[in-house]
Amino acid sequence: MYEIDDLVYTDAGVYWNAKGVKRFEEYIQMLKDGEFLITFQSSYLEKDYSKGDILKFTGHYNDDNVLMSLQLLSGIVIIKKNAEGMRFVEDWYELCHHHFNLISDKVSAVPCIRGFVENRHDQSALSLLAKQRRHIEISYKETLPLSLDWSQMEAFPIQARQYKKKKMQWKEKHIFELKKPYMALIAWYLKRYKHFYFSPTTKVYW
């Protein structure tokens, strides 16, 4: 990438809506107007999806304004390649690669905030680092309607709905079922000996 290029990142499977090109151009104009980081909200509170360790490390543990704000998505982000944008990416990389315990499912040494559900890994890192600096937040209403009525979303370019996966063939399904005891054993090992946790809704796959 060249200096001052714009990086638009979305997870594989995120739906791009061609009818939303006008709004997408508005996102890019925000960067031209001097912003360097455009983030997109999830519909969940930060305190519920970031464990105590990472909240303390990033200086947000006692900051109610951050704790009660909506967590930002790591699967949709727009960054300008300038000094500020590069610093943000470097900080994100540093935290994820050199402080892995902060983004892992290991039980937090620092007590989690009441209502905690689970840590969101690199997303918790991106969200909390973004909130340390100037950034734009696009409302979750532009990426995910709570009613799941996607017909409301024609004006918006980036939508957090996944393309449907191909239905598994009989052989693939059979192999997957046979692997379940192995996956359960690994999950038990991680919980028992590595002090990881998994919420009741977490699916553990390898």
Where are these regions (language model features)?
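Glycosyltransferase catalytic domains, chiefly GT-A lineage
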Residues: 1-206
